[in-house]
């Protein structure tokens, strides 16, 4: 009765109006699962391949019909007949069927859509919530959210090099309260921006994209919003930055060129100067987490940054690790970073995603479950965050339904768990020594 009888993919749109995949899986019993695949704007060069059609006459070349066809005409016939509860077996079968190290033949988007749909169908078959199916009886930790309320870099037209300025309500007693705090700060920030005559249009991830006078102006304005909402920076609410440094790193000159986003007169920093600058920010502001502070291929820079700041602040590898255990294993061995960002479409299956989270935890690294800038109404990452007791999640600002869908799912999960639910706040940053 739990045998897969049908697999079907279709092309749908993501939050940027670009095509992506939606996959449905059916079983003999009538159990059903649907998965939708996100897409990134600033992507690491080592990520699994997102298969696009390349036909400029259709969606500007971004169509996903090839990936859809790979699901319907290749993958389907290989996994029909599997027990839907055999997640690892199905994921491994798809990896073998693709046969490439980066899923470039079938497309990571095709494989991931099936992987998510299989998990959802299994949960439906067993009549349990997805987080419970994936995590088992010890599922209980609601993640501390990192809310991207200022969008810069490749996520907006704002002239700021850093891609994300986040608030982290780690001092809240529950996830529900953390979400309320974040929403109140978001609205306080909007009021401050209006008073300054700055833009309140939002970027890809729902954060504002104003024309700040550099990084410090952005951070200081957020601190004012935290205080205006009635909270204490560095006690109730902390700051997080996603530098996305690979987006403005000049590999030929080996410098971090802020002029790419901030224009003439902006800083151009060597790796050593980049580390010095990040240290200045950490010493000046209540920053608790920095993502991709160095370029994805600057291993020496990452090691130096970790040696300098690794005990004070969370250093998250996104483009640096691309949710890949091979890169993470190297990072652990070389003491580079102390946290990994988890993006399901960087690696392409739930099995490999869970492997990366497990490896990180065993090494004392934190794992931050994350959305992509091109999202859908699919809320699977909320369930993954709770299922793995990851303790941290990045899923955008307090606007745009594609972001709010994940927050609302976490509210439901917290409500369902009842007294068992734990919100660990600062304790979720167990990689810090201070």
UniProtKB/Swiss-Prot annotation:
SMART domains: Enolase_C (SM01192), Enolase_N (SM01193)
Swiss-Prot/TrEMBL GO biological process terms: glycolytic process
Gene Ontology CC entries for this record: cell surface; extracellular region; peptidoglycan-based cell wall; phosphopyruvate hydratase complex
Keyword terms, alphabetized: Cytoplasm, Glycolysis, Lyase, Magnesium, Metal-binding, Secreted
Binding site for (2R)-2-phosphoglycerate: 163, 343, 372-373, 394
Pathway: Carbohydrate degradation; glycolysis; pyruvate from D-glyceraldehyde 3-phosphate: step 4/5
Reactions the enzyme catalyzes: (2R)-2-phosphoglycerate = phosphoenolpyruvate + H2O
Cofactor binding, per record: Binds a second Mg(2+) ion via substrate during catalysis.
Named cofactor requirement(s): Mg(2+)
Pfam family, one: Enolase_C
Source superkingdom: Bacteria
EC top class, as a word: lyase
Positions contributing to Mg(2+) binding: 242, 291, 318
GO molecular function: magnesium ion binding; phosphopyruvate hydratase activity
EC number: 4.2.1.11
Protease as UniProt keyword: no
Catalytic center residues: 205, 343
Family matches, as InterPro entries: Enolase, Enolase-like_C_sf, Enolase-like_N, Enolase_C, Enolase_CS, Enolase_N
SUPFAM superfamilies, per the entry: Enolase C-terminal domain-like, Enolase N-terminal domain-like
NCBIfam families xrefs: eno
Function: Catalyzes the reversible conversion of 2-phosphoglycerate (2-PG) into phosphoenolpyruvate (PEP). It is essential for the degradation of carbohydrates via glycolysis.
Family: Belongs to the enolase family.
This protein's name: Enolase
Gene field: eno
